[in-house]
Every structure is written in structure tokens, then in C-alpha cells.
């Protein structure tokens, strides 16, 4: 990529229909893990006007009221009025869970290459990424896209902007000069709103109360603001669009700054490497950058179903590494256990911590439960690299 360019990332709020689905799926997962930490869960959700459908594969000893979990999640998000198109009290919730296939279970329960360890729950490839564009070691565009819709939610919940409704989207376009963020070129923010507010009022409030308090002022240089550019956003959430689990995988990760292996996260227990290995790859990449081994780091891992050890662990630092990418990859394999069971132990993943991940990004958030955001291996890596 050229050194001078524009790059865009987007995010969506907790009230976006796809995020409603993600949060319900992860709330179901958490409710199960709270009772049965070894459960196998693949919980999918569809939500539309007045309707929630829960489907997938679950094998567990837990006794969970799935319908109540779905209603509680919808209530927490803020869909508590029939005028919003879905109401936690009155919506229909259909449950259609099956059990995990025994053909899959036999490979996960016992790995074909290591009988003392758990095999991967599926084949696949996963990526982790980190860079020094923000203190959280995340790309600037996706980090601030998340913070914008998070701010929208805060102002809706605390009543400062009472006409806001749960659904919102943000998009941040950043101008890079010499490969570094230089300024914010364009901000798009679309927010659902009450019908009796004017476009002029929305625009002023969004720019002054949401955008400017979030974005660094030194980055706002001739920035273009596009606020509700269609002119009206009253119908939103699951009424405006059907929501599905796993439809916001780029929002969930790095906003397009890194490749994505294609596997979604929400609703999946840690035996699914789509989720756990992507978290581990972020943990690896963040520690590499925190150690000063590179300014940016992309990690790819891949697995075969029923096999514990990753097929490959590949590191790419885009020319920013202090040592070779191959040497960093060697250090990664020496200091991180990337077998599925090793990941679960390393990051303490058998906990009901996942609903919080399902909105505003799985990465780049300093939450106490987000063990994959720790940089506790940075000093070890730095010493091992001889820096």
C-alpha cells in the first residue's frame, strides 16, 4: 500500500439488528457457561419485526430459559417499546436448538495428533492484528468508529439526548501520510431517532455531543461530517432490517485493516477455533507490538478439525519489524501455546464473559474480562529477541 492514502472503517451500535442477534447468541452462551463450562455451543439468532428465532447446536447439562435470556437481552439493549418494531415483552421467541454432531464431538473431545489435548472444533484460518496507531494497539479508523457509536449509546441511556434510539452506525475515513494517521477526512454517523426531531437538530447534536468529544481535536482538519445523510432514520433495528448472528465480522475485528478468516465469533464456545484462536492471535500480535518487536503485526494461524496443533503460525510485520518475521514466528511458537486447549487455559476462556464482546468490538478494549488484551508476554518476547 502507498504511504499516502485514505482508509475507512465502520462500526454499529448495540441496537443494530445484526448486533442484537450477536448479543442474544452470546447471552445464551454465557448463561450456559455459568452452569456448564464444558458445554458445546453454537448459538445462532435471527431477529426481525416482533420475532426472534434461536437455532443451532447445543450440548450441555445446563438448564437455561433461552426465551427469557433473549427477552432480557433485548430489554437491556433498549427495545422496550412496540413503536420500535420489537419489544422485549411482546416479541415472539422461537427455540430450535439441536445437539452437536457426534462426528464432530469425537474429534474435539480427543485430538488425533495428541490424545492429551483437545482437537480443533473445525478447520479454518484465523488472523490477529495489532499496530501502534492508538494506545490500545488498534488501527485508528476502527477504534474511533467504535467509540462514536458507544458515545451514541451513552447519551441515549443517560437521557442527555432523549430522542436517540438504539440503532446507529458510524464510519471514519482517515488520511494517512507517510503511513501514519494524519487527519480525519470524513465522519459518517447515522442514528435512529424519534420522529419529532428535525434534521438540523440531529446534525448539530451529533457533531457537538458525539463526534467532537470522541475524536482527537488535532485530527479534525477540514473534516467532512455526514450526519443521517438520508435525512430520516426513524425505522431501525430489527424492524428496519433482519438481524443475523455473525454478519458484522469486520466490525468485530480490525475494520478491514487486517484479513479475516471468515469465521464469526458470537454464540460459539471456546472449542471453536473461529473464536478462541482469533482471540489468541490478537493476544500474540498485541504482545509483539507491545514488546517493540514491530510497529504492526499480523498473525495467521490455521487448524484441521480434530487436530490440536496449528498447521501454520505465520507472522507478517509489513517491514516494521526489528527482527525478521520468521524469527518472530519462532518466538511466538516458543512462548504461546496455540493448541485449542492451550488457548483456553492461557486466556481463561471457560467463563461467562462473552456478551460484553458482542458490541463495540472484541479487540482494543481494556475490559478486565478481556484476557487477550493483556501484554504480559511483552517483556518475555523482548528479552528473547535480544532487544
UniProtKB/Swiss-Prot annotation:
Domain of life: Bacteria
Catalysed reactions, as listed in the record: L-methionine + ATP + H2O = S-adenosyl-L-methionine + phosphate + diphosphate
Binding positions (ATP): 16, 167-169, 232-233, 241, 247-248, 264, 268
GO function terms (MF aspect): ATP binding; magnesium ion binding; methionine adenosyltransferase activity
Amino-acid positions noted as binding L-methionine in the UniProt annotation, renumbered to this chain: 57, 100, 241, 272
Major localization class: cytoplasm
Record-listed Mg(2+) binding positions: 18
Any GO BP: S-adenosylmethionine biosynthetic process
Keyword flag Ion transport: no
Matches recorded under SUPFAM superfamilies: S-adenosylmethionine synthetase
Subcellular location: Cytoplasm
Positions bound to K(+): 44
Cofactor binding notes: Binds 2 divalent ions per subunit. Binds 1 potassium ion per subunit.
UniProt feature coiled coil, ranges: none
Record's function text: Catalyzes the formation of S-adenosylmethionine (AdoMet) from methionine and ATP. The overall synthetic reaction is composed of two sequential steps, AdoMet formation and the subsequent tripolyphosphate hydrolysis which occurs prior to release of AdoMet from the enzyme.
Cited NCBIfam families: metK (TIGR01034)
Subunit note: Homotetramer; dimer of dimers.
Entry similarity comment: Belongs to the AdoMet synthase family.
Protein name (record): S-adenosylmethionine synthase
Organism from which the protein derives: Cupriavidus pinatubonensis (strain JMP 134 / LMG 1197) (Cupriavidus necator (strain JMP 134))
GN (gene name): metK
